[in-house]
Amino acid sequence: MSVLSGLNTKVVKNGDPAPAPPASGTIRIYNMRYCPWAQRALIFASLKKIPTEVINIHLDQKPDWFFTKHYKGQVPALEHDEGKKIVIESAVIPEYLDDIYPEPRIIPTDHYEKVQQKLLLDRISGQLSSAFYGVVQAAKISDLLKEKLVELAKAYDTAEELLTGDFYSGTSKPGFVDYLIYPNIQRAFWTSHIIKDFPLKVESFPGPNYPKLSKWYKRLDSIPEVIATSQPTETAVEFFKSWIIGAPNFDYGL
């Protein structure tokens, strides 16, 4: 049974009333079902089996009250202790959850190893996400799109090179880097169904040019905490089509 209550519920938007504080003993994550950054927090909550209430936010029509949860009005935002504590930012929330719910521990407790994981995340995630969103923004401009597709392939070349074992954690289990980069890579998988000449291939994603990443993606894609926080591929592809043309349907599939 999933610990994530409300994951597949319709968005709240401007004009909707603010929810009551989260119940004692639970956390609340403000989310958007297709957002890779919010999925980072959901994965950690699912993995640690934390009773979690999920509230989905309409990112184009944000409720005024949501800016009291995140000053930029972004997801994810974490609320707990009956609303007394709020934590924001997609790389900060997982670390916070790892500290207050330490079983199972994901981030190394050794200070040096912890720093190395954060540096690796910064190197891989920054390049992958920048290249991917560059492609999406250029999707309707053919000359620019070709340039951005080359940049995306280079970003995946780097990710392939930096994967030296089964996982970026350097252990036999996925870790901080694996869980935090997976959502953006999953969005690239969805987009590979849509954009012509996409350098990442649907079959054995991201394709034969990335043999280590293909095995890594297959491993991550089959673990319970990823399955529990992901949307069906067919649904996600249709959402991304609406997003790419600038008319995102945040409730698609509900």
From Swiss-Prot:
Keywords per UniProt: Oxidoreductase, Repeat, Transferase
Catalytic residues identified in the record: C35
Catalytic activity: RX + glutathione = an S-substituted glutathione + a halide anion + H(+); L-dehydroascorbate + 2 glutathione = glutathione disulfide + L-ascorbate; methylarsonate + 2 glutathione + H(+) = methylarsonous acid + glutathione disulfide + H2O
Domain GST N-terminal stretches: 25-105
Ligand binding (glutathione): K62, V75, E89, S90
Name of the gene: gsto-2
Entry protein name: Probable glutathione transferase omega-2
EC number in record: 2.5.1.18, 1.8.5.1, 1.20.4.2
Annotated SUPFAM superfamilies: GST C-terminal domain-like (SSF47616), Thioredoxin-like (SSF52833)
Domain GST C-terminal: from-to ranges: 110-239
GO terms assigned for molecular function: glutathione dehydrogenase (ascorbate) activity; glutathione transferase activity; methylarsonate reductase activity
GO biological process: glutathione metabolic process
Family per record: Belongs to the GST superfamily. Omega family.
InterPro entries: Glutathione-S-Trfase_C-like (IPR010987), Glutathione-S-Trfase_C_sf (IPR036282), Glutathione_S-Trfase (IPR040079), Glutathione_S-Trfase_N (IPR004045), GST_C (IPR004046), GST_omega (IPR005442), GST_Omega/HSP26 (IPR050983), Thioredoxin-like_sf (IPR036249)
